[in-house]
Amino acid sequence: MAVQGPWVGSSYVAETGQNWASLAANELRVTERPFWISSFIGRSKEEIWEWTGENHSFNKDWLIGELRNRGGTPVVINIRAHQVSYTPGAPLFEFPGDLPNAYITLNIYADIYGRGGTGGVAYLGGNPGGDCIHNWIGNRLRINNQGWICGGGGGGGGFRVGHTEAGGGGGRPLGAGGVSSLNLNGDNATLGAPGRGYQLGNDYAGNGGDVGNPGSASSAEMGGGAAGRAVVGTSPQWINVGNIAGSWL
């Protein structure tokens, strides 16, 4: 809860745990010296979230709602387990431009992914992989990447020869293989590897792409899906760039 008036002194102690105004000012990121304690009103101490469990179906809308609920409070998210978007059609994380938080820090100690694209089938090319981060708050997003930030791999292209059709492999991570009416399906991708396209003699559907890479075309020249992007939108403040698969800014 932010510092409130009219009893600013007791309010800042409750918010920061600091009895001395100078120490409370540091906790509340008040940099002016000298300062009036009235400048504490509306400010909050940094909130720290620890994410220690893997989530392979993460929904960005949940995170947006939680951040909005904090108002102007800055939030630090320590990501200590792998996170994957629930669909290649949505990024793993999205930070809309109207988020009220003073700043948001991502300390990434694991791998975070856009989801891999679905493999194509018959005359259809592979589907694109999902993006990882959509940032529309500029440098209010701070990224300390000690793990991997990955766009999802594209799905492999399908093929059809005569009445025979087969599915391409899913893009890494967790992209679904293309499903054929003849049950000649592409393999689903795992967290660690893209799926293989169905092989039928000299004909084949395309393999799914690894993270940050497009899927492969089939022998019938149905193209693979485009790679998902790692970071899209406006440039964040990079504390540490680290390992990235896919385009970023």
Curated annotation (Swiss-Prot):
Site (Interaction with the fiber protein p37): W7, W20, W36
Keywords, alphabetical: Host-virus interaction, Receptor, Viral attachment to host cell, Viral tail protein, Virion, Virus entry into host cell
Position of sequence motif GRM 8: 204-210
Main localisation: virion
Locus of motif GRM 3: 151-161
Chain positions of motif GRM 10: 222-229
GO biological-process terms attached to the record: adhesion receptor-mediated virion attachment to host cell; symbiont entry into host cell
Subunit structure: Interacts with host OmpC receptor; this interaction allows the reversible adsorption of the phage on the host membrane.
Domain notes: The N-terminus is involved in binding to the fiber protein p37. The C-terminus contains glycine-rich motifs (GRM) and mediates the host specificity. The glycine-rich motifs assemble into a 3-layered PG(II) sandwich domain.
Protein name: Receptor-recognizing protein gp38
Organism: Salmonella phage S16 (Salmonella phage vB_SenM-S16)
Organism classification: Viruses, Duplodnaviria, Heunggongvirae, Uroviricota, Caudoviricetes
